[in-house]
């Protein structure tokens, strides 16, 4: 998105889970407002403050909004499985017998030590995805299957990477005191020494643990041994939690309480005194029904004692390979109710509010209160109890993480954006493009749509000839069509105009085309029936995506061929994709439970006569170009620091004196990105270079100018996206008048502007790459940034690749709008060429992403070669994000994967996403 999300979720029921509220804090007929990833309002919709009236509105259809679910106790990162132990237990072996036979935790230790960090991440992601699919937004992940320093660190790093791979918050817990590794030969004291003197200091130094845990049980560690670990954790200022009283009562609950632990978990054998101690200390009881069920325990945790004492209770999956291979918090809630006799309210609070409390993050999440993170789960249920009582049923409609609606494994898109034709902002259009959300026209516009349709019906029934209603098309406009043939005329129009060639446009482009067509028709000047509108809306909601070939439009009279293919699917002809399968239009509609529409007078013409394909392609290019432009400022700052360049050219007054807004914004961004760099401070004095080359010194002037024309193109395209562009139009006085709004010249010019900006951003980025690999220009860096030049070629050919991509973009940047050719027997004798002018932007921005990705690799490596000097805090975050995907270059290696990964980090917004808010310039100035 171009800016932080500002969204109002309307027509909802909200379970706030506020602590003192009864009945889950349920509010009927409610609204929830998100701004900058935080909740700013949660209450009755009829009391919604006026200040939020301009925010984007999403109609939740009376669905239930709860806090995002939180799994507060998992061992999600593990290698392999222990299915053989499951078979042993079925034969009667106890937990202790399995452990003493070399199984249990020690078995998982062997597997984890043999796995790489990448292996662990790869194996864990499907388990995490299963949780996410049920509305989970926060997951705690414990180590404890490495049991040596390197393996425990590897496990925790893999856990942290999960939060980079998926849109979910990860809390990591160091569980070194989980079991005694076999190499210790039974010497628990020596192993605890290693935990507190070797593992914990290294983990604390790297900031890898949000908490420290231990397993207090006879088969693991006794209370005095756990106390040593907790004392060490306290010295490192890390909170603690404890596996306690699962198989016997060693008074682990009381021990946890005495240290003010965040939680004590399992607790089957906890007594009333332990429950009271936990309540007094504020230690949460985390109950794990999956383990209780899986190993067929007979002693239940004392839920009644916890209630009586006022101990807070949470629920968690305890996902682990041996005793609870469970990846469903919904099933966990059901188990909590049926096995432990918890109430519905206790179960739901146990995976939201109390789970957040158990992780020490209740001030951030877990309830729907003002100021907290906008982590939400939206459910298609009538009663909250349905979350608890059903088994194997997932009613999740949408998951919202940090204010952004995130896709999940279900294919149906359930959230709907409500569009107000004529005033749909760029932010909403980008959300439709990037997130694939379905849309609907605001019902307030239906009356105008129906009024225009009624007027067209009157004209069709009359005697006067009106273009496209009772005449032929284009050069055949003089031919009168009989009233009985009007429907056939519209159908023939669609079929005859399906002349597209080439590969299908991508789903996100087609969705945007359909949304733009809704906006245009929704203005009430096109004369289509409401049935046409509702079919497009239903196709977007159900996922019926017409197959539109990429080529065939000259950008006037509208995008005829592409939009004819869109309309063909609507009438049961042509082809469409449904859930990824390419089908006939009729079959795709049928599988989605939809029926083809029979087009009435003018409807076929209204659907195909418009600029929506060109505009959608240009908008996609704009959104991609803007993200790349923001990232180019980051990589430009990296390159400047790597080359020990000066930040003096970025001084604010220089840019204020010239006055261009883009230049001012670009200069400010570069200046802020470099702020605090030790590399820069190291050459403030005594640097004999007077000026840097233009590619570093003139970044604000070049990238700022590019930003300005992107913003100009954005204004043009926002207007066009809200325009009525078919022909003829039903005017406010009821007349149907022919005009030329279908001519896409404004879109063609905007596409050319974007192409020029993309070309120039890549050109100056490529010159910075060339500077860094040239030892005569890079101020002390080795040739091609190779650590052993000659033996290694370093980034030599990566720079060549960037040059090739730059040159290709120069060729494609030639203006498309200066071309024209007459068509339709010279009736349509000047055309815009907007469609292919916009379509080329997809390839150009892909090339630009690759160039900037190469600059990221080059700049990051150059900065690393300046060690022990360090770059700024902002740029260090960028390097860390890059290194999470691409290791630093020590020796020559296969480079194509590195370049691909770096380009993806540019394209998906990862690199720009780590920069603090407010530094990088927005598209809407």
Curated annotation (Swiss-Prot):
It holds the Pfam family Lyase_aromatic. Fe(3+) binds at residues 73, 75, 243, 318. SUPFAM superfamilies: Composite domain of metallo-dependent hydrolases, L-aspartase-like, Metallo-dependent hydrolases. Residues 1-414 are annotated as: Imidazolonepropionase. InterPro entries: Amidohydro-rel (IPR006680), Aromatic_Lyase (IPR001106), Fumarase/histidase_N (IPR024083), HutH (IPR005921), HutI (IPR005920), L-Aspartase-like (IPR008948), Metal-dep_hydrolase_composite (IPR011059), Metal_Hydrolase (IPR032466). Gene3D superfamilies: Fumarase/aspartase (Central domain) (1.20.200.10), Fumarase/aspartase (N-terminal domain) (1.10.275.10), Metal-dependent hydrolases (3.20.20.140), Urease, subunit C, domain 1 (2.30.40.10). PROSITE patterns: PAL_HISTIDASE. HAMAP family: His_ammonia_lyase (MF_00229), HutI (MF_00372). This is Bifunctional imidazolonepropionase/histidine ammonia-lyase.
